[in-house]
C-alpha cells in the first residue's frame, strides 16, 4: 500500500491526514491547535506541525506530501531571515 499525506496549517490548527493513495481510505489523522488571536509567533506553527505529524504516526512510511496553509498573513523577517515580531494574521482589523 502506498501512503500519501495531506497537511493543512490554518489559522486555528495544523491538521495531518494519511491516506491510501490508491483507494483514498483514511489511514490515520491528527490535529494540533494554534493559539487564538490576530498575532502569533510563527514558532507555534512549527511546533503544531511537529505535534500533528507525531500524533499521526510520523511520515516515515509516506511516499508523498501535499501542504496547504492559511494565506493573507505576514511574517516580518530581518536580513538573516530571523522572525522579528509575531506574525500578523488575516483577521487583524486594526488598520481597517
Swiss-Prot record:
Source organism of this protein record: Arthrobacter sp. (strain NRRL B3728)
Domain of life: Bacteria
Record site feature (Important for activity), residues: 8
Disulfide pattern: none
Molecular function GO labels: ATP binding; D-xylulokinase activity
Pfam families: FGGY_N
Family, as annotated: Belongs to the FGGY kinase family.
Record: residues binding substrate: 71-72
Keyword Iron: no
Biological processes per GO annotation: D-xylose metabolic process
Protein name: Xylulose kinase
Function field: Catalyzes the phosphorylation of D-xylulose to D-xylulose 5-phosphate.
SUPFAM superfamilies named among the record's database cross-references: Actin-like ATPase domain
Keywords: ATP-binding, Carbohydrate metabolism, Kinase, Nucleotide-binding, Transferase, Xylose metabolism
Catalyzed reactions: D-xylulose + ATP = D-xylulose 5-phosphate + ADP + H(+)
